[in-house]
UniProtKB/Swiss-Prot annotation:
Protein name per UniProt: Tripeptidyl-peptidase 2
Modified residues (N6-acetyllysine): K401
Role: Cytosolic tripeptidyl-peptidase that releases N-terminal tripeptides from polypeptides and is a component of the proteolytic cascade acting downstream of the 26S proteasome in the ubiquitin-proteasome pathway. It plays an important role in intracellular amino acid homeostasis. Stimulates adipogenesis.
Pfam (any one): TPPII_C
Modified residue annotations for N-acetylalanine: A2
Record's GO cellular component terms: cytosol; endoplasmic reticulum; nuclear body
Catalyzed reactions per annotation: Release of an N-terminal tripeptide from a polypeptide
PROSITE patterns: SUBTILASE, SUBTILASE_HIS, SUBTILASE_SER
Length: 1262
């Protein structure tokens, strides 16, 4: 056996499939038509120019003609201009940058900027580098430092048993060092590399240099021009292996550092057009084609596509006159074939003859799961994913070859508006090149992301041949050739494979043979606002229906008017299904003609039915249809009370990859379904996909979708539940995984349940006190246990600023159509550390279908540090924020300023996740709710029985801090008592759970808090009844006014005058202390500060204060007033001690002996220093009697006391606490200095690298 296996040749052809599509046979016939002369734009995560196979084409041209990042994720603001001094400039990082003498810069000015590497590193690379840096740079040094600190602590504990004040401080110092090192290890956070960037003009072109070594020696760094000028690129280092190129915009004021955001884009490009001169068997489908790499996956958003990236990309596609676009991206859309992005794609296709190929999506196996734009946009060729037997062996190493099939996850049509959705299919897996930073040469990936470039490469071969023979083609003729020559697989349904598997050689022959004018045209098919006939809900198939269908020719952009006038087409219309009736002929000219199609689905069996009305040119019927009208009808099964609203299937046989679809009319009143799957096989475990979709108008399929990938063990059972909408058809699909070997038999049951709430959403206003909702059990006996859980509080913001401006050179559509941006600024306070989800309600959940170009928000802290960003899908972009003030900047782009101006007051919301969920009390009748008595627990409802419930308001002490009027609490209502019923109350609409939402949402609107009576206010009211003598009031007011002006005028005379008049008035001495301590010349008046502090301390009866604090309770009637007075005295005493201590410490820290001073002076200074030190020590220990050293007021004094005693561990402990309280750059620098004094250079280095990230010069660019 072993010998036979080793003798069998390796199936190289299955690694990157070309046989299945006819690409191999085409290249055998026409080896010169290998993609030469064809330019493919790859819109993806970016292509690595250093990856294997990405260097040259078969005819020696550069493989990648340009590399562009249209997202802005690699943009660096280089608007700051500087001139070198002595051949050096100071970068924005603070590093000294040495300008090499051989650089040419006639103007002598450099644009500088700064960029954190982790801002544009791919996620996988960032994680790898973080791990490596910790293991190599941090861990070895930190372990030594920690071991040394522990050793010193242990030695001191052994040698010193005494508890003197000096020993106590030393012990605290050593303990602080150990605690700090342990804390730094726990809080370790790698800032990553911080790169200084330079841009300048050498007299001929713009050049850029990135200080990739982070040491300022620019002579060892690459100098690059725009990639398109000379195909130059460099790498950030041998550890990263991340290749980058640059583009310079706006006269040097903006540098774009272009890297790949993930491995996806390079893999896609390698499939389409990779070329290996030495190993041709590894070639992509079209090795002779060139590539334009456009990065549309924004690294800031985990390579999510954005409107900005896509519209800029289409501008570049048009400007570069690309022949083909490959777009292996897409999302579910609420309405197909619409939106600004789709408009720009249509313009590139229809007006500029660019063929746009895109993935259909990976959201199958249910119907109508095609993504946008691949399966929903008329101008785009959507490609499904097919797997062949050779691929199974070569790529997946399956034990046995299975029949060819569509991948289980490949999205299926039709589109929601009736269009077929999937145009063609191609192999959906490959082992191909990936970027160098992955540290691997190739990788297996699968998805419609891989089938799209395979088809795109095949089309490139066709175009290469057409161009070589000067055969004219249009996007319409090429698409028709692909669809009319594709091979249909018998065992794969039309909605999965579309028109079939692409056949390159046959498509080429078709275009050579069919060159008529009619074949160059496109035809728009409309059925009202739809593109096909899609009858899915029960009411739509209950009776025959007539449909008006519009057919209109679409002429290529350069068509002469005379050709339009003379256009006359004689069409034969055919339908191969008896349930569809259509006219037999149509005369078409340059206008939209309408025909009537009658659909009578009454005699159709349960299940799915598809047919087409095809239009043939009677002059060349063998060329296939010129257009098709797709018609889909779904006949749903019915469940009723007699079957207990259940559907049961027993001993159902499943082959590998087999799919069984069940369309069911959901009973009116049903709210969830339960699916039970049981294996009948005792020897085979099997992988299954359970998938259910209900379609709602103008809602994406993911809004009402359930998906579960599961492994079913031998004789095992699986139970799942998901929400449903009553009265509409649902598709439930159970599919055996495509690679799951051996046959298996299973039983499965679908059971419907219904507990209906009168309100689809509960809106509760706190002022109403009691809110009612009614619940009905619609189908069966159901166990109820209603529960309202509040999970977040939502804050609504209004913009504090809105600015509109025209964008730069990258944002101009053809015919000089300038794009504009509006930037709205919002501010909010985060009351405590927690998770937030920012979103723009007006625009969120809209991407391709949005009427605005794009939306992008970035959140900044008060130092302008970027904390996170997000766009159309807010639930993907939750982030954790510490307590503090934050700014959100929201960018919205559009071609019309007037449309942007409408949004200048656009609200924005921030959802704050609650650390602990809150519950609202629910009662079964109004009187119980009114009295706050017995809460509802659980009950059983008979069918059709109605039960009211009453919800009471949330206690005021439960309202989260920071939430107030204008805010609301958000959560959900669950009704069922059973675990499955509760599980169905949460809808995981997308398989990644990104769009998880509540089936019955609850909004609890807040009102102002109750007015609180302050302590002692009653006593003050009584005191106020005793009218003061007016003269006495005037005297006191005059005194207070003089004290106020004393601090402003710095008048010692006023102080002395008041001191004589009011010798026992404590606020006077406090004001004097604060005045002296806040002066600019403070360092010259330290002794006066000490005296002023002593004066304050002497006027406080510390004995009486200590006795009061020791009291457990105060029975006196004016206890509240006494407490306020004592609290103020304690606070004043601590304040005075700290200010005195700081002054003494500053005196010692800044007193330095002068060289050559007289011996007597030196002795006097030494005695003075000892006296000051003694006084400082007394003050320190006195302070510890009254408060904790980590109290905010005491921190600076404790910090300075530690510095005086050269106890840098204690000092650093207090300094880190100061940073937590007030994270200023100066406080961080103090920490860094102490780290260096302690010898912890690794901590200092990492913290220093954090500074330019935490304190950037300005907000980052969009």
């Amino acid at each position: 056996m072993a010998t036979a296996a080793t003798e069998e040749p390796f199936p190289f052809h299955g690694l990157l499939p070309k046989k299945e599509t006819g690409a191999s046979s085409f290249l055998c016939r026409y080896p010169e038509y290998d993609g030469r002369g064809v330019l493919i734009a790859v819109l993806d995560t970016g292509v690595d120019p250093g990856a294997p196979g990405m260097q040259v084409t078969t005819d020696g041209k550069p493989k990648i003609i340009d590399i562009i990042d249209t997202t802005g994720s690699g943009d660096v603001n280089t608007a700051t201009e500087v001139e070198p001094k002595d051949g050096e400039i100071i970068g924005l990082s603070g590093r000294v940058l040495k300008i090499p003498a051989n650089w040419t810069n006639p103007l002598g000015k450099y644009h500088i900027g700064i960029k954190n590497g982790y801002d544009f590193y791919p996620k996988a690379l960032k994680e790898r580098i973080q791990k490596e840096r910790k293991e190599k740079i941090w861990d070895p040094i930190h372990r030594v430092a920690l071991a040394e600190a522990c050793r010193k602590q242990e030695e001191f504990d052994i040698a010193n048993n005494g508890s003197s004040q000096a020993n106590k401080l030393i012990k605290e110092e050593l303990q602080s060092q150990v605690e700090l090192l342990n804390s730094f290890e726990k809080k370790y956070s790698d800032p990553g590399p911080v790169y200084d960037c330079l841009v300048w003009h050498d007299g001929e072109t713009w050049r850029a240099c990135v200080d990739s070594n982070e040491n300022g020696d620019l002579s060892k760094c690459a100098v690059l021009r725009n990639y398109k000028e000379a195909q130059e690129y460099s790498s950030f280092g041998t550890a990263e292996m991340l290749n980058y190129s640059v583009n310079i915009y706006d006269d040097g004021n903006l540098l774009s550092i272009v890297t790949s955001g993930g491995a996806h884009g390079t893999h896609v490009a390698s499939i389409a057009a990779g070329h290996f001169p030495e190993e041709p068997e590894r070639n992509g489908v079209a090795p002779g084609a060139q590539i334009l790499s456009i990065k549309i996956g924004d690294t800031r958003l985990s390579t999510m596509e954005t409107g900005t990236g896509l519209i800029r990309a289409m501008i570049e596609v048009i400007n570069h006159k690309c022949d083909l676009v490959n777009y292996s991206y897409g999302e579910a859309t609420h309405w197909p074939n619409s939106g600004r992005i789709c408009e720009v794609i249509n313009e590139a296709v229809w007006k500029h003859n660019t063929i746009y190929v895109s993935s259909a999506g990976n959201n199958g196996p249910c119907l109508s799961t095609v993504g946008c734009p691949g399966g929903t946009t008329s101008s785009v060729i959507g490609v499904g994913a097919y797997v062949s037997p050779d691929m199974m062996v070569a790529e997946y190493s399956l034990r046995e070859k299975l029949p060819a099939n569509q991948y289980t996850w490949s999205s299926r049509g039709p589109s929601a508006d009736g269009a077929l959705g999937v145009s063609i299919s191609a192999p959906g897996g490959a082992i191909a090149s990936v970027p160098n930073w992955t540290l691997r040469g190739t990788q297996l990936m699968n998805g419609t992301s891989m089938s799209s470039p395979n088809a795109c490469g095949g089309i490139a071969l066709v175009l290469s041949g057409l161009k070589a023979n000067n055969v004219d083609y249009t996007v319409h003729s090429v698409r028709r050739a692909l669809e009319n020559t594709a091979i249909k697989a018998d065992n794969i349904e039309v909605f999965a494979q579309g028109h079939g598997i692409i056949q390159v050689d046959k498509a080429y022959d078709y275009l050579i043979q069919n060159t008529s004018f009619a074949n160059r045209l496109g035809f728009t098919v409309t059925v009202g606002n739809n593109r096909g006939i899609y009858l899915r809900d029960p009411v739509q198939v209950a009776a025959p229906s007539d449909h008006g269908v519009g057919i209109e020719p679409v002429f290529p952009e350069n068509t002469e008017n005379s050709e339009k006038i003379s256009f006359q087409l004689h069409l034969a219309l055919t339908s191969n299904s008896s349930w569809v009736q259509c006219p037999s002929h149509l005369e078409l000219m340059n206008q939209c003609r309408h025909i009537n199609i009658r659909v009578d689905p009454r005699g159709l069996r349960e299940g799915l039915h598809y047919t087409e009305v095809c239009g043939y040119d009677i002059a060349s019927p063998n060329a296939g249809p010129l257009f098709r009208v797709p018609i889909t009808a779904v006949i749903a099964a019915k469940v009723n009370e007699s079957s207990h609203y259940d559907l049961a299937f027993t001993d159902v046989h499943f082959k590998p990859g087999q799919i069984r679809r069940h369309f069911v009319e959901v009973p009116e009143g049903a709210t969830w379904a339960e699916v039970t799957v049981c294996s009948c096989s005792s020897e085979v475990s099997a992988k299954f996909v359970l998938h259910a979709v209900q379609l709602v108008k103008q809602r994406a399929y993911r809004s009402h979708e359930f998906y579960k990938f599961c492994s079913l063990p031998e004789k095992g059972t699986l139970i799942e539940a998901f929400p449903v909408l009553g009265g509409k058809a649902i598709e439930f699909c159970i599919a055996r995984w495509w690679a799951s070997l051996s046959d298996v038999n299973i039983d499965y049951t679908i059971s419907f349940h219904g507990i209906v709430c009168t309100a689809p959403q509960l809106n509760i206003h706190a002022s109403e006190g009691i809110n009612r909702f009614d619940v009905q059990s619609s189908l069966k006996y159901e166990d109820l246990a209603p529960c309202i859980t509040l999970k977040s509080w939502v804050q609504t913001l209004r913009p504090v600023n809105a600015k509109t401006r025209p964008l730069g050179s990258r944002d101009v559509l053809p015919n000089n159509r300038q794009l504009y941006e509006m930037v709205l600024t919002y501010s909010f306070h985060q009351p405590k550390s927690g998770e937030v989800t920012p979103s723009c309600p007006l625009l969120c959940e809209l991407l391709y279908e949005s009427e605005f170009d794009s939306q992008l928000w970035i959140i900044f802290d008060q130092n302008k540090r970027q904390m996170g960003s997000g766009d159309a899908y807010p639930h993907q972009y939750s982030l954790k924020l510490e307590k503090g003030d934050y700014t959100i900047r929201l960018q919205i782009r559009h071609e019309q300023i007037s449309d942007l101006d409408r949004l200048k007051d656009l609200p924005f919301i921030v959802s704050h996740r609650l650390s602990n969920t809150l519950s609202l009390d629910i009662h079964e009748n109004h009187s119980l709710a009114l009295l706050g008595k017995k809460k509802s627990s659980s009950l059983t409802l008979p069918p059709k029985y109605n039960q009211p419930f009453f919800v009471t308001s949330l206690p005021d002490d439960k309202i989260p801090k920071g939430a107030g009027p204008g805010c609301y609490l958000a959560g959900s209502l669950t009704l069922s008592k059973t675990e499955l019923g509760k599980k169905a109350g949460q809808s995981a609409a997308k398989r990644q759970g990104k769009f998880k939402k509540d089936v019955i949402p609850v909004h609890y609107y807040l009102i102002p808090p109750p007015t609180k009576i302050k302590n002692g206010s009653k006593d003050k009211e009584k005191d106020s009844e005793k009218e003061k003598d007016l003269k006495e009031e005037f005297t006191e007011a005059l005194r207070d006014l003089k004290i106020q002006w004393m601090t402003k005028l710095d008048s010692t005379d006023i102080y002395n005058e008041l001191k004589e008049t009011y010798p026992a008035y404590l606020p006077l001495y406090v004001a004097r202390l604060h005045q002296l301590d806040a002066e600019k010349e403070r360092m010259k008046r330290l002794n006066e500060i000490v005296d002023a502090a002593n004066a304050v301390i002497s006027h406080i009866d510390q004995t009486a204060l200590a006795v009061y604090i020791a009291m457990k309770t105060d029975p006196r009637p004016d206890a509240a007033t006494i407490k306020n007075d004592m609290d103020k005295q304690k606070s004043t005493l601590i304040d005075a001690l700290c200010r005195k201590g700081c002054a003494l410490a500053d005196h010692l820290l800044h007193t330095q002996p002068h060289d050559g001073a007289a011996a007597g002076d030196a002795e006097a200074k030494e005695e003075e220093g000892e006296s000051t030190m003694e006084s400082l020590s007394e003050t320190y220990w006195e302070t510890t009697k009254w408060t904790d050293l980590f109290d905010t007021k005491v921190l600076i004094f404790a910090y300075k006391h530690a510095l005086v005693n050269k106890m840098y561990g204690r000092g650093l402990k207090f300094a880190t606490k100061l940073v937590e309280e007030k994270p200023t750059k100066e406080n961080w620098k103090n920490c860094i200095q102490l780290m260096k004094l302690l010898g912890w250079t690794h901590c200092a280095s990492f913290t220093e690298n954090w500074l330019p990230i935490m304190y950037p010069p300005d907000y980052c660019v969009f």
